[in-house]
Amino acid sequence: MTAPVTAPTTMPAQTPPTVETDVVTEAPRPLDDDILARARRQVLDEGRGLDEQDVLAVLQLPDEALGDLLALAHEVRLRWCGPEVEVEGIISLKTGGCPEDCHFCSQSGRFDSPVRSAWLDVPSLVEAAKATAATGATEFCIVAAVRGPDQRLMAQIREGVAAIREAVDINVACSLGMLTQEQVDELAGLGVHRYNHNLETARSHFPKVVTTHSWEERWETCELVRAAGMELCCGAIIGVGESLEQRAELAAQLAALEPDEVPLNFLNPRPGTPFGDLPAVDSREALRTIAAFRLALPRTILRYAGGREITLGDLDVQGMLGGINAVIVGNYLTTLGKNPESDLAMLTELRMPIKSLQATL
């Protein structure tokens, strides 16, 4: 197929956001053994997320404390989010050929990766949505590898969202890169339930991960989405060379943004990308990160996203018992995920009910 010419998205003129978590003005608190007790009082009892310094203290806990940490994060999830798990499927409408240089992504046209540009037609979108709904999922996200949508892509989204909503009883979400105000308004008018646009990593680390656009541009799109009344899905990719301090910084920045959902991706190093030789995140470190983000975001949907298979394997059950309350079923955009039956069996074994569509409306 012939790849479309992707028009650069013109971002609205806005003042770059000032995030209070960028600068710590108070004296650093000493790392102590009471962080879990403090988290129990503040997060479990009061529903207030940990700040950046306390998230860092959690990330620095020794392996011996991991069991207690996961148990606390699970209690927080149950108290403030409930026992249900939200299930989502995703589909790539436009794959590959992206003009951006996100160093972890094999869909960038700037890297020598095996992913080639391709488009999916509307009937295929509808069939994928039907298959997703058959798993019990309440969310179906249409994703495109672009800087932002051009006219062709918006026309395809217009047609695809209408066809899915007519044929399938499922919430439709989109992930189409950076948006203009006009595009945000149109997506909201189409009935798009949720929009995904990840911060990816901490503001201080972002220039080492992406150079073709700024962290502030991503933040601006997220703010536009929230203002338009769509639910905001904004998450992270863990393991892209960030320090623990920067991981805590990101958690605090996400808390300041207040998204409805935070998907946690773990780096699955892709051949041909600048981060293709980075190591996968250690499983214990990944579980600590999940729990730390739950303690920073006690009321937020925290979703398993890409990379959990290579990072955690069968230990992904521990993440479900350590703060996670949503999953993506099936394959990801360019990598394989677990088959849906395996994930659904895991939820059944854990006696975790799947959130009904009515509960999301």
Swiss-Prot record:
CDD domains assigned: Radical_SAM (cd01335)
EC number(s) given by UniProt: 2.8.1.6
BP GO terms, sorted: biotin biosynthetic process
Single GO MF annotation: 4 iron, 4 sulfur cluster binding
Pfam families: BATS, Radical_SAM
Highest taxon, organism lineage: Bacteria
The Radical SAM core domain, residue ranges: 83-308
SUPFAM superfamilies: Radical SAM enzymes
Catalytic reaction list: (4R,5S)-dethiobiotin + (sulfur carrier)-SH + 2 reduced [2Fe-2S]-[ferredoxin] + 2 S-adenosyl-L-methionine = (sulfur carrier)-H + biotin + 2 5'-deoxyadenosine + 2 L-methionine + 2 oxidized [2Fe-2S]-[ferredoxin]
Cofactors: [4Fe-4S] cluster; [2Fe-2S] cluster
Residues the entry annotates as binding [2Fe-2S] cluster: C141, C174, C233, R303
Binding partners and assembly: Homodimer.
NCBIfam families per UniProt: bioB
Family in the record: Belongs to the radical SAM superfamily. Biotin synthase family.
Protein name in the entry: Biotin synthase
Organism field: Parafrankia sp. (strain EAN1pec)
